[in-house]
Protein backbone atom coordinates (compact mmCIF):
# COMPACT_ATOMS: atom_id res chain seq x y z
CA UNK A 1 0.00 0.00 0.00
CA UNK A 2 1.40 3.40 -0.99
CA UNK A 3 1.99 6.05 1.65
CA UNK A 4 2.57 8.88 -0.83
CA UNK A 5 0.38 11.97 -0.43
CA UNK A 6 -2.16 13.26 -2.91
CA UNK A 7 -0.52 16.56 -3.70
CA UNK A 8 -3.30 18.17 -5.77
CA UNK A 9 -2.76 20.14 -8.97
CA UNK A 10 -0.97 22.47 -9.14
CA UNK A 11 0.43 21.90 -5.67
CA UNK A 12 3.16 24.54 -5.60
CA UNK A 13 4.50 27.51 -7.48
CA UNK A 14 8.26 27.13 -7.34
CA UNK A 15 11.06 28.88 -9.16
CA UNK A 16 8.57 30.78 -11.30
CA UNK A 17 6.81 27.65 -12.61
CA UNK A 18 3.51 26.02 -11.71
CA UNK A 19 4.51 22.58 -10.49
CA UNK A 20 2.46 19.66 -11.77
CA UNK A 21 0.67 17.14 -9.57
CA UNK A 22 2.78 14.44 -11.17
CA UNK A 23 5.35 14.43 -13.95
CA UNK A 24 5.75 11.92 -16.73
CA UNK A 25 9.52 12.34 -16.54
CA UNK A 26 11.84 13.93 -13.97
CA UNK A 27 15.47 14.33 -15.04
CA UNK A 28 18.10 14.87 -12.34
CA UNK A 29 20.80 17.19 -13.68
CA UNK A 30 20.95 19.60 -16.61
CA UNK A 31 24.07 18.59 -18.49
CA UNK A 32 24.21 17.79 -22.23
CA UNK A 33 22.49 14.40 -21.84
CA UNK A 34 19.53 16.01 -20.04
CA UNK A 35 19.33 18.91 -22.48
CA UNK A 36 19.25 16.67 -25.53
CA UNK A 37 16.75 14.32 -23.87
CA UNK A 38 14.34 17.23 -23.34
CA UNK A 39 15.06 18.63 -26.81
CA UNK A 40 14.26 15.33 -28.48
CA UNK A 41 11.07 14.81 -26.48
CA UNK A 42 9.91 18.17 -27.83
CA UNK A 43 10.67 17.02 -31.39
CA UNK A 44 8.69 13.83 -30.81
CA UNK A 45 5.68 15.97 -29.88
CA UNK A 46 4.10 13.81 -27.18
CA UNK A 47 3.45 16.74 -24.80
CA UNK A 48 4.90 14.90 -21.85
CA UNK A 49 5.10 16.66 -18.49
CA UNK A 50 8.85 17.02 -18.01
CA UNK A 51 10.81 18.46 -15.10
CA UNK A 52 14.58 19.04 -15.07
CA UNK A 53 16.23 19.60 -11.67
CA UNK A 54 19.66 21.24 -11.33
CA UNK A 55 21.70 22.05 -8.23
CA UNK A 56 23.43 24.99 -9.92
CA UNK A 57 22.29 28.20 -11.56
CA UNK A 58 20.79 29.25 -14.87
CA UNK A 59 23.54 29.52 -17.47
CA UNK A 60 23.42 33.34 -17.64
CA UNK A 61 23.96 33.48 -13.86
CA UNK A 62 27.01 31.23 -13.85
CA UNK A 63 30.07 33.38 -13.21
CA UNK A 64 33.51 32.36 -12.02
CA UNK A 65 35.27 35.15 -10.08
CA UNK A 66 38.77 33.81 -10.74
CA UNK A 67 39.30 35.94 -13.87
CA UNK A 68 38.53 39.15 -11.96
CA UNK A 69 40.32 38.52 -8.68
CA UNK A 70 42.97 36.01 -9.76
CA UNK A 71 42.13 33.20 -7.38
CA UNK A 72 39.45 30.60 -6.71
CA UNK A 73 37.01 31.66 -3.97
CA UNK A 74 35.38 28.20 -3.74
CA UNK A 75 31.87 29.47 -4.41
CA UNK A 76 29.07 28.21 -2.17
CA UNK A 77 27.05 26.07 -2.30
CA UNK A 78 28.43 24.84 -5.64
CA UNK A 79 31.18 25.79 -8.08
CA UNK A 80 29.83 27.72 -11.08
CA UNK A 81 32.35 26.02 -13.37
CA UNK A 82 30.99 22.53 -12.71
CA UNK A 83 27.35 23.17 -11.74
CA UNK A 84 24.45 24.84 -13.51
CA UNK A 85 22.67 24.53 -16.83
CA UNK A 86 24.81 22.48 -19.27
CA UNK A 87 26.99 21.19 -16.43
CA UNK A 88 30.73 21.46 -16.99
CA UNK A 89 30.01 21.81 -20.72
CA UNK A 90 29.34 25.55 -20.59
CA UNK A 91 32.83 26.34 -19.34
CA UNK A 92 34.69 23.52 -21.04
CA UNK A 93 36.80 24.04 -24.12
CA UNK A 94 33.84 22.61 -26.04
CA UNK A 95 35.33 19.74 -28.04
CA UNK A 96 32.81 17.47 -29.75
CA UNK A 97 34.42 14.11 -30.54
CA UNK A 98 33.00 12.50 -33.69
CA UNK A 99 34.19 9.28 -35.33
CA UNK A 100 35.96 7.85 -38.37
CA UNK A 101 33.56 6.22 -40.81
CA UNK A 102 35.73 3.12 -41.04
CA UNK A 103 35.88 2.59 -37.27
CA UNK A 104 34.20 -0.59 -36.06
CA UNK A 105 34.09 0.55 -32.44
CA UNK A 106 34.50 3.69 -30.33
CA UNK A 107 37.83 4.35 -28.62
CA UNK A 108 36.80 7.58 -26.87
CA UNK A 109 33.63 9.10 -25.51
CA UNK A 110 32.18 6.13 -23.64
CA UNK A 111 30.35 2.88 -24.30
CA UNK A 112 26.94 3.90 -25.63
CA UNK A 113 27.59 1.52 -28.53
CA UNK A 114 27.50 -1.44 -26.15
CA UNK A 115 23.79 -0.75 -25.60
CA UNK A 116 22.58 0.40 -29.02
CA UNK A 117 25.25 -0.88 -31.41
CA UNK A 118 28.02 0.90 -33.33
CA UNK A 119 25.93 1.95 -36.33
CA UNK A 120 23.13 3.34 -34.18
CA UNK A 121 25.65 5.26 -32.08
CA UNK A 122 27.10 6.83 -35.24
CA UNK A 123 23.60 7.85 -36.33
CA UNK A 124 22.90 9.41 -32.92
CA UNK A 125 26.18 11.33 -33.01
CA UNK A 126 25.37 12.60 -36.51
CA UNK A 127 21.95 13.73 -35.31
CA UNK A 128 23.40 15.49 -32.24
CA UNK A 129 26.06 17.11 -34.41
CA UNK A 130 23.38 18.60 -36.67
CA UNK A 131 21.71 20.14 -33.62
CA UNK A 132 24.99 21.70 -32.50
CA UNK A 133 25.51 23.05 -36.02
CA UNK A 134 21.96 24.42 -36.07
CA UNK A 135 22.75 26.37 -32.91
CA UNK A 136 25.97 27.83 -34.26
CA UNK A 137 28.80 25.32 -33.90
CA UNK A 138 31.81 25.87 -36.16
CA UNK A 139 31.41 23.99 -39.45
CA UNK A 140 35.14 23.28 -39.58
CA UNK A 141 36.28 19.83 -38.45
CA UNK A 142 39.73 19.42 -36.92
CA UNK A 143 41.87 16.36 -37.55
CA UNK A 144 40.76 15.36 -41.05
CA UNK A 145 43.15 17.21 -43.41
CA UNK A 146 46.56 15.72 -42.63
CA UNK A 147 46.15 11.95 -42.89
CA UNK A 148 49.74 11.25 -43.97
CA UNK A 149 51.28 13.41 -41.25
CA UNK A 150 49.07 11.82 -38.59
CA UNK A 151 50.07 8.37 -39.85
CA UNK A 152 53.75 9.23 -39.37
CA UNK A 153 53.16 10.40 -35.80
CA UNK A 154 51.15 7.24 -35.12
CA UNK A 155 54.04 5.13 -36.43
CA UNK A 156 56.49 6.84 -34.07
CA UNK A 157 54.10 6.33 -31.17
CA UNK A 158 53.74 2.61 -31.91
CA UNK A 159 57.50 2.19 -31.54
CA UNK A 160 57.16 3.46 -27.96
CA UNK A 161 54.21 1.21 -27.13
CA UNK A 162 51.73 4.08 -27.35
CA UNK A 163 48.60 4.22 -29.48
CA UNK A 164 47.50 7.45 -31.14
CA UNK A 165 43.73 7.81 -31.45
CA UNK A 166 42.88 10.34 -34.12
CA UNK A 167 39.24 11.26 -34.73
CA UNK A 168 37.48 14.31 -36.17
CA UNK A 169 36.81 17.02 -33.59
CA UNK A 170 34.45 19.96 -33.78
CA UNK A 171 35.87 22.66 -31.54
CA UNK A 172 33.30 25.03 -30.10
CA UNK A 173 35.53 27.00 -27.76
CA UNK A 174 34.37 28.10 -24.33
CA UNK A 175 32.64 31.25 -25.63
CA UNK A 176 30.66 29.43 -28.32
CA UNK A 177 29.74 26.53 -26.02
CA UNK A 178 28.24 29.02 -23.57
CA UNK A 179 26.19 30.70 -26.33
CA UNK A 180 24.91 27.41 -27.76
CA UNK A 181 23.75 26.11 -24.39
CA UNK A 182 22.13 29.46 -23.53
CA UNK A 183 20.06 29.24 -26.73
CA UNK A 184 19.12 25.65 -25.93
CA UNK A 185 18.06 26.66 -22.42
CA UNK A 186 15.79 29.33 -23.93
CA UNK A 187 14.36 26.82 -26.42
CA UNK A 188 13.44 24.33 -23.70
CA UNK A 189 11.70 27.02 -21.66
CA UNK A 190 9.82 28.31 -24.69
CA UNK A 191 8.52 24.78 -25.21
CA UNK A 192 7.16 24.39 -21.68
CA UNK A 193 9.90 22.25 -20.17
CA UNK A 194 9.80 22.89 -16.41
CA UNK A 195 13.23 23.60 -14.91
CA UNK A 196 14.11 23.92 -11.23
CA UNK A 197 17.47 25.57 -10.53
CA UNK A 198 19.50 25.78 -7.31
CA UNK A 199 17.68 22.67 -6.10
CA UNK A 200 19.17 19.36 -5.00
CA UNK A 201 17.59 15.94 -5.10
CA UNK A 202 18.03 14.86 -1.51
CA UNK A 203 16.67 11.36 -2.09
CA UNK A 204 14.84 9.08 -4.49
CA UNK A 205 11.35 7.86 -3.58
CA UNK A 206 11.25 4.12 -4.22
CA UNK A 207 8.53 1.67 -3.19
CA UNK A 208 8.64 -2.06 -3.89
CA UNK A 209 11.64 -1.51 -6.14
CA UNK A 210 9.74 0.99 -8.33
CA UNK A 211 10.47 4.70 -8.65
CA UNK A 212 7.75 7.04 -7.42
CA UNK A 213 9.49 10.41 -7.46
CA UNK A 214 12.15 12.48 -5.72
CA UNK A 215 12.68 14.51 -2.56
CA UNK A 216 14.12 17.98 -3.08
CA UNK A 217 15.44 20.88 -1.05
CA UNK A 218 17.21 24.19 -1.86
CA UNK A 219 20.88 23.88 -2.80
CA UNK A 220 21.80 26.32 -0.03
CA UNK A 221 20.65 23.64 2.45
CA UNK A 222 22.95 20.98 1.01
CA UNK A 223 24.89 20.58 4.27
CA UNK A 224 21.82 20.91 6.50
CA UNK A 225 20.60 17.38 7.17
CA UNK A 226 17.69 18.76 9.21
CA UNK A 227 16.30 20.89 6.36
CA UNK A 228 12.76 20.11 5.22
CA UNK A 229 12.36 18.34 1.90
CA UNK A 230 9.50 18.35 -0.59
CA UNK A 231 8.28 15.43 -2.67
CA UNK A 232 7.68 15.54 -6.41
CA UNK A 233 6.05 12.50 -8.00
CA UNK A 234 6.86 11.04 -11.40
CA UNK A 235 6.14 8.04 -13.58
CA UNK A 236 9.80 7.84 -14.57
CA UNK A 237 13.04 9.38 -13.30
CA UNK A 238 16.25 9.74 -15.30
CA UNK A 239 19.59 10.10 -13.51
CA UNK A 240 21.90 12.41 -15.48
CA UNK A 241 24.16 13.85 -12.81
CA UNK A 242 27.49 13.84 -14.66
CA UNK A 243 30.86 13.20 -13.07
CA UNK A 244 30.09 15.94 -10.56
CA UNK A 245 27.34 13.70 -9.17
CA UNK A 246 29.48 10.57 -8.75
CA UNK A 247 29.50 10.73 -4.96
CA UNK A 248 25.73 11.36 -4.77
CA UNK A 249 25.07 8.43 -7.07
CA UNK A 250 27.19 6.05 -5.00
CA UNK A 251 25.18 7.08 -1.94
CA UNK A 252 21.88 6.44 -3.76
CA UNK A 253 23.05 3.03 -4.98
CA UNK A 254 24.06 2.00 -1.47
CA UNK A 255 20.89 3.32 0.14
CA UNK A 256 18.41 1.83 -2.34
CA UNK A 257 20.33 -1.27 -3.50
CA UNK A 258 20.52 -0.04 -7.08
CA UNK A 259 22.70 -2.56 -8.90
CA UNK A 260 26.06 -1.24 -10.09
CA UNK A 261 29.57 -2.35 -10.95
CA UNK A 262 32.65 -0.83 -9.37
CA UNK A 263 33.95 2.14 -11.32
CA UNK A 264 37.45 3.51 -11.80
CA UNK A 265 39.17 6.74 -10.89
CA UNK A 266 41.66 8.51 -13.15
CA UNK A 267 44.40 10.29 -11.21
CA UNK A 268 47.02 12.50 -12.77
CA UNK A 269 48.23 15.97 -13.61
CA UNK A 270 47.57 18.85 -16.01
CA UNK A 271 50.69 19.30 -18.16
CA UNK A 272 51.61 22.69 -19.64
CA UNK A 273 54.25 23.22 -22.29
CA UNK A 274 54.94 25.69 -25.12
CA UNK A 275 52.81 25.70 -28.27
CA UNK A 276 56.07 25.51 -30.21
CA UNK A 277 56.72 22.00 -28.90
CA UNK A 278 53.19 20.83 -29.69
CA UNK A 279 52.86 22.66 -33.01
CA UNK A 280 52.58 19.55 -35.20
CA UNK A 281 50.02 17.85 -32.97
CA UNK A 282 48.03 21.08 -32.69
CA UNK A 283 48.11 21.67 -36.44
CA UNK A 284 47.44 18.15 -37.68
CA UNK A 285 44.92 16.95 -35.08
CA UNK A 286 44.13 19.83 -32.72
CA UNK A 287 43.92 17.18 -29.99
CA UNK A 288 46.11 14.11 -29.99
CA UNK A 289 44.78 11.28 -27.83
CA UNK A 290 47.72 9.11 -26.78
CA UNK A 291 47.17 5.91 -24.78
CA UNK A 292 49.81 3.49 -23.55
CA UNK A 293 50.96 1.06 -20.88
CA UNK A 294 54.53 2.11 -20.22
CA UNK A 295 56.93 1.59 -17.34
CA UNK A 296 57.13 -1.30 -14.90
CA UNK A 297 53.48 -1.36 -13.82
CA UNK A 298 51.83 -1.48 -17.26
CA UNK A 299 48.97 0.70 -16.03
CA UNK A 300 46.82 2.49 -18.58
CA UNK A 301 48.05 6.06 -19.05
CA UNK A 302 46.44 8.51 -21.46
CA UNK A 303 46.34 12.11 -22.53
CA UNK A 304 43.02 13.89 -22.32
CA UNK A 305 41.50 17.31 -23.05
CA UNK A 306 44.34 18.95 -25.00
CA UNK A 307 44.01 22.73 -25.30
CA UNK A 308 46.24 24.47 -27.88
CA UNK A 309 47.02 28.07 -26.88
CA UNK A 310 44.84 27.37 -23.86
CA UNK A 311 44.63 28.16 -20.18
CA UNK A 312 44.92 25.98 -17.10
CA UNK A 313 41.97 26.47 -14.75
CA UNK A 314 40.81 25.59 -11.25
CA UNK A 315 37.40 24.25 -10.27
CA UNK A 316 35.79 23.01 -7.08
CA UNK A 317 34.10 19.66 -6.58
CA UNK A 318 32.28 18.07 -3.66
CA UNK A 319 33.78 18.41 -0.19
CA UNK A 320 35.43 21.70 -1.30
CA UNK A 321 38.14 19.94 -3.30
CA UNK A 322 40.08 22.12 -5.74
CA UNK A 323 40.85 20.27 -8.99
CA UNK A 324 42.77 21.44 -12.03
CA UNK A 325 41.38 21.49 -15.57
CA UNK A 326 42.07 23.23 -18.86
CA UNK A 327 40.20 25.37 -21.38
CA UNK A 328 40.71 26.93 -24.78
CA UNK A 329 38.95 29.81 -26.45
CA UNK A 330 38.25 30.79 -30.04
CA UNK A 331 39.53 34.34 -29.54
CA UNK A 332 41.57 34.53 -26.33
CA UNK A 333 44.95 32.79 -26.72
CA UNK A 334 48.05 31.97 -24.69
CA UNK A 335 51.38 30.68 -25.99
CA UNK A 336 51.06 27.36 -24.14
CA UNK A 337 49.31 24.06 -24.74
CA UNK A 338 47.89 22.16 -21.79
CA UNK A 339 46.62 18.59 -21.52
CA UNK A 340 45.84 16.03 -18.86
CA UNK A 341 47.98 12.96 -18.25
CA UNK A 342 45.82 10.45 -16.40
CA UNK A 343 46.45 7.03 -14.86
CA UNK A 344 43.48 4.67 -14.51
CA UNK A 345 43.08 3.05 -11.09
CA UNK A 346 41.01 -0.09 -10.55
CA UNK A 347 40.46 -1.64 -7.14
CA UNK A 348 39.06 -5.06 -6.25
CA UNK A 349 39.55 -6.69 -2.84
CA UNK A 350 39.64 -5.86 0.03
CA UNK A 351 39.58 -2.14 -0.85
CA UNK A 352 37.07 -1.10 -3.50
CA UNK A 353 36.33 2.60 -3.05
CA UNK A 354 37.89 4.39 -6.04
CA UNK A 355 36.12 7.69 -5.38
CA UNK A 356 37.32 7.77 -1.77
CA UNK A 357 40.85 6.98 -2.90
CA UNK A 358 40.86 9.79 -5.46
CA UNK A 359 39.35 12.22 -2.97
CA UNK A 360 42.09 11.45 -0.43
CA UNK A 361 44.79 12.14 -3.03
CA UNK A 362 43.12 15.44 -3.94
CA UNK A 363 42.69 16.42 -0.29
CA UNK A 364 46.37 15.84 0.47
CA UNK A 365 47.44 17.89 -2.55
CA UNK A 366 45.06 20.69 -1.56
CA UNK A 367 46.55 20.75 1.93
CA UNK A 368 50.05 21.06 0.49
CA UNK A 369 48.86 24.02 -1.57
CA UNK A 370 46.90 25.69 1.27
CA UNK A 371 43.67 24.97 -0.61
CA UNK A 372 45.09 25.85 -4.03
CA UNK A 373 46.31 23.93 -7.05
CA UNK A 374 49.98 22.90 -6.85
CA UNK A 375 52.42 23.46 -9.73
CA UNK A 376 55.91 22.01 -10.16
CA UNK A 377 58.61 22.11 -12.85
CA UNK A 378 59.33 18.74 -14.45
CA UNK A 379 63.06 19.32 -13.96
CA UNK A 380 62.59 19.81 -10.23
CA UNK A 381 60.79 16.47 -9.98
CA UNK A 382 63.74 14.76 -11.67
CA UNK A 383 66.08 16.53 -9.24
CA UNK A 384 63.99 15.44 -6.25
CA UNK A 385 63.17 18.96 -5.07
CA UNK A 386 60.17 21.24 -4.77
CA UNK A 387 59.64 24.27 -7.02
CA UNK A 388 59.99 27.71 -5.42
CA UNK A 389 58.21 30.88 -6.50
CA UNK A 390 61.44 32.61 -7.56
CA UNK A 391 62.34 29.64 -9.75
CA UNK A 392 58.91 29.75 -11.35
CA UNK A 393 59.38 33.44 -12.19
CA UNK A 394 62.57 32.58 -14.10
CA UNK A 395 61.01 29.58 -15.85
CA UNK A 396 60.72 29.72 -19.64
CA UNK A 397 57.19 28.25 -19.46
CA UNK A 398 55.00 30.87 -17.78
CA UNK A 399 52.07 29.31 -15.89
CA UNK A 400 48.64 30.37 -17.16
CA UNK A 401 46.98 29.52 -13.83
CA UNK A 402 48.25 32.46 -11.78
CA UNK A 403 46.73 31.21 -8.52
CA UNK A 404 48.68 27.92 -8.60
CA UNK A 405 51.12 27.50 -5.71
CA UNK A 406 54.64 26.17 -6.46
CA UNK A 407 55.50 23.12 -4.42
CA UNK A 408 56.12 19.37 -4.60
CA UNK A 409 53.29 17.22 -5.96
CA UNK A 410 55.24 14.00 -5.34
CA UNK A 411 54.50 14.29 -1.61
CA UNK A 412 50.85 13.42 -2.30
CA UNK A 413 50.69 11.47 -5.56
CA UNK A 414 51.54 7.82 -4.97
CA UNK A 415 54.86 6.38 -6.16
CA UNK A 416 53.21 4.03 -8.64
CA UNK A 417 51.06 6.77 -10.18
CA UNK A 418 53.96 9.23 -10.33
CA UNK A 419 56.19 6.61 -11.93
CA UNK A 420 53.54 5.94 -14.58
CA UNK A 421 53.29 9.66 -15.37
CA UNK A 422 57.04 10.22 -15.62
CA UNK A 423 57.60 7.12 -17.75
CA UNK A 424 54.81 8.25 -20.05
CA UNK A 425 56.38 11.70 -20.41
CA UNK A 426 59.74 10.11 -21.29
CA UNK A 427 58.08 7.95 -23.95
CA UNK A 428 56.16 10.92 -25.35
CA UNK A 429 59.43 12.85 -25.66
CA UNK A 430 60.52 10.35 -28.32
CA UNK A 431 57.32 11.09 -30.25
CA UNK A 432 57.14 14.85 -29.65
CA UNK A 433 60.59 16.37 -29.18
CA UNK A 434 60.63 18.64 -26.15
CA UNK A 435 57.75 16.92 -24.37
CA UNK A 436 60.13 16.19 -21.46
CA UNK A 437 61.63 19.69 -21.35
CA UNK A 438 62.59 20.39 -17.71
CA UNK A 439 60.76 23.75 -17.76
CA UNK A 440 57.41 22.11 -18.57
CA UNK A 441 54.88 22.36 -15.75
CA UNK A 442 52.82 19.79 -13.86
CA UNK A 443 49.69 20.95 -12.02
CA UNK A 444 47.84 18.75 -9.54
CA UNK A 445 45.42 17.32 -8.76
CA UNK A 446 43.64 16.42 -11.99
CA UNK A 447 41.22 13.65 -11.09
CA UNK A 448 38.28 12.27 -13.04
CA UNK A 449 35.73 10.71 -10.71
CA UNK A 450 33.56 8.07 -12.36
CA UNK A 451 30.68 6.73 -10.33
CA UNK A 452 29.93 3.07 -9.97
CA UNK A 453 28.77 1.98 -13.41
CA UNK A 454 25.04 1.42 -13.12
CA UNK A 455 23.81 -1.89 -14.48
CA UNK A 456 21.19 -0.96 -17.07
CA UNK A 457 19.29 -2.75 -19.81
CA UNK A 458 19.12 -1.77 -23.49
CA UNK A 459 16.47 0.84 -22.64
CA UNK A 460 18.87 2.39 -20.07
CA UNK A 461 16.64 1.25 -17.19
CA UNK A 462 18.35 0.39 -13.90
CA UNK A 463 17.46 -2.45 -11.55
CA UNK A 464 14.74 -0.16 -10.13
CA UNK A 465 11.62 -0.07 -12.30
CA UNK A 466 11.12 3.32 -13.94
CA UNK A 467 14.58 4.62 -12.96
CA UNK A 468 16.98 5.28 -15.85
CA UNK A 469 20.55 6.49 -16.29
CA UNK A 470 22.31 8.41 -19.08
CA UNK A 471 25.44 10.46 -19.64
CA UNK A 472 28.71 10.49 -17.75
CA UNK A 473 27.26 10.08 -14.25
CA UNK A 474 26.24 6.44 -14.48
CA UNK A 475 29.34 5.40 -16.40
CA UNK A 476 27.84 5.24 -19.90
CA UNK A 477 29.66 8.17 -21.54
CA UNK A 478 32.71 10.38 -21.14
CA UNK A 479 32.31 13.60 -23.06
CA UNK A 480 29.92 16.13 -24.55
CA UNK A 481 29.00 14.43 -27.81
CA UNK A 482 28.26 10.91 -26.64
CA UNK A 483 26.46 12.27 -23.57
CA UNK A 484 24.26 14.31 -25.92
CA UNK A 485 23.65 11.23 -28.05
CA UNK A 486 22.64 9.18 -25.01
CA UNK A 487 20.03 11.80 -24.13
CA UNK A 488 18.52 11.61 -27.61
CA UNK A 489 18.23 7.83 -27.42
CA UNK A 490 16.77 8.06 -23.90
CA UNK A 491 14.00 10.33 -25.22
CA UNK A 492 13.17 7.80 -27.91
CA UNK A 493 13.15 4.99 -25.35
CA UNK A 494 10.68 6.95 -23.22
CA UNK A 495 8.44 7.89 -26.13
Please identify what each model-predicted range represents.
Residues 5-11, 20-103, 109, 146-495:
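Residues forming the flavin
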Residues 14-16:
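Short intrinsically disordered terminal tails
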Amino acid sequence: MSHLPNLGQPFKKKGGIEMKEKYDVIVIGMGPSSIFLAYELIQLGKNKRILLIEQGKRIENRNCPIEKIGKCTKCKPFCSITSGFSGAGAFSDGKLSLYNKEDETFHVGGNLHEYVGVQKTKELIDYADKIYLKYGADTKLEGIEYKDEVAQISKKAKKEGIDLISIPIRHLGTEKAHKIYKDLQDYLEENKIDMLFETIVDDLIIENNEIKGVKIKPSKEVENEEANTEMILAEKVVIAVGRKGANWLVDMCNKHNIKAKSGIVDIGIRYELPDSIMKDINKYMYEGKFVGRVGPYRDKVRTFCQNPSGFVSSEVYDKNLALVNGHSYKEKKSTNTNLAILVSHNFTYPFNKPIDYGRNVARNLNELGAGNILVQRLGDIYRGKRTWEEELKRNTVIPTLKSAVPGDITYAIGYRTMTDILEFIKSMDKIVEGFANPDNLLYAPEIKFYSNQLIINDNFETSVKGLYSIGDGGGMTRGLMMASASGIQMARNLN
